[in-house]
């Protein structure tokens, strides 16, 4: 098992980008594909796209991001790649429904973002679980799927 205990930088950093580019031409860049919830973790065990058994053990002040470089030497590199995130798009009927939906999403500790008048909830589990909790607002039309 390969222990990865620090973030060396981002793949977009000029100092790292050239080295990563050269290694990628040689087929020596491995990726660790992480979900939106896993990327928040500091301790995690998973396999790279090449099958390398990796254990991530970061200090609390370090935060993984898409493109975090966890290993880089003359032979290979290991880079974090964030999986596509899925969102549930909801549109409230009016301002009162928008406030209620926002309050509810906050109480549920759901990660959200806004796109115009649409509230997008980051799905960290089955969509059906979210829809079940939102059923009363969806049923009476206070909120609809966008």
From Swiss-Prot:
Transmembrane segments: none annotated. The keyword Cytoplasm applies. SUPFAM superfamilies: Urease metallochaperone UreE, N-terminal domain (SSF69287). One of its GO terms (molecular function) is unfolded protein binding. GO terms for biological process: protein folding. Pfam families: UreE_N (PF02814). Involved in urease metallocenter assembly. Binds nickel. Probably functions as a nickel donor during metallocenter assembly. Its main location: cytoplasm. GO terms for cellular component: cytoplasm. Keywords: Chaperone, Cytoplasm, Nickel, Nickel insertion. It comes from Pseudomonas syringae pv. syringae (strain B728a). It is found in: Cytoplasm. Belongs to the UreE family. This is Urease accessory protein UreE 1. SMART domains: UreE_N (SM00988). InterPro entries: UreE, UreE_N, UreE_N_sf. The keyword Methyltransferase does not apply.
């Amino acid at each position: 098992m390969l222990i990865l205990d620090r973030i060396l930088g981002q793949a977009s950093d000029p100092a790292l980008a050239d080295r990563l580019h050269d290694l990628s031409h040689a087929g020596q860049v491995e990726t660790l594909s992480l979900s939106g919830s896993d990327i928040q973790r500091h301790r995690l065990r998973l396999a790279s796209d090449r099958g390398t058994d990796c254990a991530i053990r970061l200090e609390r002040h370090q935060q993984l991001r898409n493109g975090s470089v966890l290993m880089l030497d003359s032979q290979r590199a290991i880079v974090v790649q964030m999986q596509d995130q899925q969102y549930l798009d909801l549109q409230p009927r009016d301002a009162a429904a928008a406030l209620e939906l926002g309050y509810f999403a906050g109480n549920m500790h759901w990660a959200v973002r806004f796109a115009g008048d649409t509230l997008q909830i980051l799905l960290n589990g089955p969509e059906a679980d979210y829809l079940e909790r939102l059923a009363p607002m969806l049923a009476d039309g206070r909120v609809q799927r966008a």
